[in-house]
């Protein structure tokens, strides 16, 4: 029987096998835009690609991540803050209201990213580092710092979840329907999950 659209699985398998042969004593990690059920066995994690830096895209990332989880693909990450930035945010001297909206959007995205299997900030302009969010006294900086510290405190828990993925067919993101399958309301919720 032939398998259609298995590119990601075969690609991840090839990269994994090549890395294991080249460096058998080192762990392998494959970050890929493509996805296929079972690719996690080859140390592959999917990221959602170069999405736009908008509120709509942030909402879509949450729903998309839950879809990945329900599809049996547990390792997911995003470009926190988005990657393709609207011009009003990326100007050399953005309007004050645009700069403030960027900080708020980036902060909310960072908070979401704290509760993903892989927390990953990525992008160029505007800067996404917490110290670029308006200085140490700015609420955006303080929120980034708080959630960064929270993520580090959660690392033992995240490692435990990873063990559950490997040994118990678990997942990181659990849409409400996974824990409350008899609840009709939980089946309709596409923007909340347990971690």
Predicted regions and their residues:
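Catalytic-domain carbohydrate-binding cleft regions of carbohydrate-active enzymes
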Residues: 1-195
């Amino acid at each position: 029987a032939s398998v259609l659209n298995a590119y990601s699985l075969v690609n991840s398998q090839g990269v994994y096998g090549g890395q294991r042969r080249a460096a058998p004593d080192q762990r392998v990690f494959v970050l890929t835009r493509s996805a296929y059920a079972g690719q996690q066995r080859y140390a592959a994690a999917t990221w959602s690609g170069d999405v736009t830096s908008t509120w709509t895209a942030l909402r879509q990332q949450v729903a998309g991540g839950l879809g990945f989880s329900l599809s049996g693909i547990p390792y997911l990450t995003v470009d926190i803050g988005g990657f393709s930035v609207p011009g009003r945010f990326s100007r050399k001297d953005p309007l004050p209201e645009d700069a403030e909206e960027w900080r708020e959007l980036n902060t909310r995205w960072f908070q979401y990213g704290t509760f993903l299997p892989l927390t990953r900030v990525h992008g160029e302009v505007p800067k996404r580092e917490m110290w670029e969010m308006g200085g140490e006294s700015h609420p955006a900086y303080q929120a980034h710092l708080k959630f960064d510290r929270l993520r580090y405190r959660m690392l033992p828990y995240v490692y435990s979840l990873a063990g559950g993925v490997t040994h118990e067919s678990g997942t990181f993101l659990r849409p409400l329907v996974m824990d409350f399958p008899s609840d009709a309301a939980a089946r309709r919720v596409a923007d909340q999950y347990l971690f």
